[in-house]
Amino acid sequence: MAKAVILMMDSFGIGGAKDAAAFGDAGANTFLHIAQNYPEFGGNGLALPNLESLGLANAGELASGVRAPLVSERAKMTLAGRCKYGCMEEISAGKDTISGHWEMAGVPVRQDFGHFPLEYPSFPAEMVARICERAGIPGILGNKAASGTVIIQELGEEHLASGKPIFYTSADSNLQIAAHEEKFGLERLYKLCEIAFEEVKPYRIARVIARPFAGEKNGAFVRTKNRHDYALNPPAPTILDKAKAAGLQVTAIGKISDIYAGSGVTRKVLASGLEELWDKTLEEVQNLNGDGIVFTNFVDFDMMWGHRRDVKGYAEGLMYFDRRLPELEPLLGEDDVVFITADHGCDPTYPGSDHTRECVPVLMFGRKVPAQNIGRRKTYADIAETIAAKFGLEPFGIGTAF
């Protein structure tokens, strides 16, 4: 029996992308800039002893040529010498969540998704009219690019008074719809998003995201954990599909199942927040009998701290992640492997609030994994190729196993 565990540190880029300037992201480096700037926010310095023992600082230096300044602490990882480390370039046309995850699963996105304008009005009037008519809503609020946590404080009370849901977008390929979980209704919000997902297809939009929230007045509204993503299906079989077809178990934790539209997933586990995501990951790894994949997305790095340009929060989240990492070791069998990686960057020191085009780390450890610098990889798909080789699945012919 063997397991492949993928820990996706959403948005934890390590700089050095050769095409960063083409995306307006020259010099962006999520890892390095957090390490350099965290002390200015009252921290004593970024301490990631367990990730560092697995080669994270080396991977960062491979990507950008600069070594991140980390506080030296003793690692608790017994498998510190059983790790391959490197960095990976992205070949997909975008720097969004879907592109990064699909490419890592063996299906690069060669043509960028469609995007709605960031300026008001973001959404075509005829599309909005069709959605309103089909869903039976009196209209919409927002209709612009916005931070989801900010716009519910701005328009939450008006939403409650009018019954109009809040529509907004971002630099990613998406339409996000926020509504009060109780007053508007969670199932009603989900149905609205299903209708909207059908209507955005001609615009090649990757996702419609339901964003339920709770509270009574502006300044006191909070998102609930019942987010749901409606995403396009990958255009070709991913490593998840191939694993499922071969009889392997594929456990998707957090938003992973939604990102792949449920394709290739045998078990979906809902969780939110770093603590619960870690708890569920450890539980699922321990309970998995037989060959399989456990895949977790740690979304807080992106959603809570990257987009909000919160250096302090991001740094503290990284250190929490690092402290939990040794708990995984005792659950690993002789043939199990763990991948630690990311889907894109989101440098909290960079102007704006968008993702940043960066290389991402790839750390692979396990009891039988030799210590090795695997260098600069040409595509995220190398992870899919490596998992395919491990389980004897048909290769993708896109990347190279390591």
Where are these regions (language model features)?
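Feature captures the catalytic ectodomains and active-site-proximal regions of enzymes
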Residues: 1-402
